[in-house]
Amino acid sequence: MGKIKELQTSLANKIAAGEVVERPSSVVKELLENAIDAGATEISIEVEESGVQSIRVVDNGSGIEAEDLGLVFHRHATSKLDQDEDLFHIRTLGFRGEALASISSVAKVTLKTCTDNANGNEIYVENGEILNHKPAKAKKGTDILVESLFYNTPARLKYIKSLYTELGKITDIVNRMAMSHPDIRIALISDGKTMLSTNGSGRTNEVMAEIYGMKVARDLVHISGDTSDYHIEGFVAKPEHSRSNKHYISIFINGRYIKNFMLNKAILEGYHTLLTIGRFPICYINIEMDPILVDVNVHPTKLEVRLSKEEQLYQLIVSKIQEAFKDRILIPKNNLDYVPKKNKVLYSFEQQKIEFEQRQNTENNQEKTFSSEESNSKSFMAENQNDEIVIKEDSYNPFVTKTSESLITDDESSGYNNTREKDEDYFKKQQEILQEMDQTFDSNEDASVQNYENKASDDYYDVNDIKGTKSKDPKRRIPYMEIVGQVHGTYIIAQNEFGMYMIDQHAAQERIKYEYFRDKIGEVTNEVQDLLIPLTFHFSKDEQLVIDQYKNELQQVGIMLEHFGGHDYIVSSYPVWFPKDEVEEIIKDMIELILEEKKVDIKKLREDVAIMMSCKKSIKANHYLQKHEMSDLIDQLREAEDPFTCPHGRPIIINFSKYELEKLFKRVM
């Protein structure tokens, strides 16, 4: 008798659910995608106990026809595909017809739906079987309630992480969906508390303001670009808002959130030396393309995709991000609230509550005076962050909204705040601020520094003109400043009417020398300096194999390496621009780069060598400078293409505004 037999439908569905429904957030994702595909303009997501107890998604979409209800919970039953060719033209978020079948096999599901000019229907499914189907009162659209998730798969339920982790995952999904569909009003409610509420205005920057807060939203830079195959649109945050992980990078293809290593790499290359090693930007990029250029059917959750002409898209993203920051003033403001990571404390719920109440009482008793723009911004933030729990460093979950800042996605329990209901005044203030911000984005100007840039642009001086003739050179983004002195032989102190500046002298000279060496390495010429005594290098046999393979690439950066017999190689000349006292060390370091990488990317090699040389040749800390030397250094920095960060991404200049200084000394409150 044969041993192979076809599995029962209920068992097959449970197995399939293991791929589709990993956790509560998977259910939210699938139901939210269905609502969007149904053409909904309003979607409400309500969860209890982070979705473990219940998940309810209500939309005003097209609804489900009565005759289709019998098929809705069948595997591979869908209205989105019909023929094989349809797989190459997918524009909907869902298409496999697996979601409802998988969900209903591991949860108890109640679905109410109604289409135009039709009576409503209700259907109840448990363990994959329809137990009840009856007429019911229902508004146009679909109302689906998922209860007791994983009730019949206790092993899966056992490995659910903390409720705060699960709620963080749900918030992540909903926020990303809200960003990619700003024309849909989306609300997320957890245990009766509003976590997110978007207005459906169609403006992505408004959604990002709701998620990240106005401070980040005002420092977003709009990007847009086209090729014959791709159109990209999005916002990238200024480098000062970088984070410690990649979770703040949101990439969408035709409205679908995806993860792609090469596109992440393109974004980081676009920022290039503006980011410190180990830091990642906040950004949102939506890519519109013909569906035939992307295969979305390669991953159970459809997060990973395969792209055609990936290199073309890569270069488009890099170029548009670089253009976005090319002529901008990127001097970071001092963060007065910064606390070192080692001092980070996750307070208990009661401690947080007491701290907040004390802070609130103090703020209520203080008399504050701001400009009209600052007043509007702080009004918005006061309403939007009224019960914020203070954790002064990045927490794991990137998409904790400003109305739910307390969510921690580690397995640590931490209370989360109660949010006040948003009243009409709040929405009015929010709308005014965001409309003003949107107008600024439309003009492709950065809202947070527009006034500063306008003022500062009138105060750029030509270093050769002491009388202060204005310079129109767009490269000159460092404002004129008066040197005051030096701290610890490391930081230059300067001032102007905008406040005080601190300049890291090592980072400043490192940037200057980096651009010099980068240009020189990129212009390899026949101008060489002969050595009276050739430099000799000794390599093992395996190292020789690598070096022989990449000798031509070394020649492209000016190193003529010749085999001298046995394990020895010689260099008898070197490019004239090499610092004479470091020729041997530079050549040795360049060869070591090749031996370490076991491959050569000429662009990267030139980059690495330029960074290495600039770092070694720059002023070190505890090196005291004369005032004229400091002034000369600032003048040279003013001529740099990217004068705000060193090649490693560390800031060169930090600005303390006059207001911030007065606040430090309690001159203003």
Swiss-Prot record:
Keyword match DNA repair: yes
Keywords linked to the UniProt accession: DNA damage, DNA repair
Keyword rRNA-binding in record: no
PROSITE patterns: DNA_MISMATCH_REPAIR_1 (PS00058)
GO biological process terms on file: mismatch repair
Compositional bias segments (type: Polar residues): 361-379
A single cellular component GO annotation: mismatch repair complex
SMART domains assigned to the protein according to its UniProt record, in alphabetical order: DNA_mis_repair, MutL_C
Domain of life per record: Bacteria
Residue span of region Disordered: 357-379
GO molecular function, one term: ATP hydrolysis activity
Annotated family: Belongs to the DNA mismatch repair MutL/HexB family.
NCBIfam families: mutl, PRK00095.1-3
Stated role: This protein is involved in the repair of mismatches in DNA. It is required for dam-dependent methyl-directed DNA mismatch repair. May act as a 'molecular matchmaker', a protein that promotes the formation of a stable complex between two or more DNA-binding proteins in an ATP-dependent manner without itself being part of a final effector complex.
The protein's name: DNA mismatch repair protein MutL
Organism: Staphylococcus aureus (strain JH1)
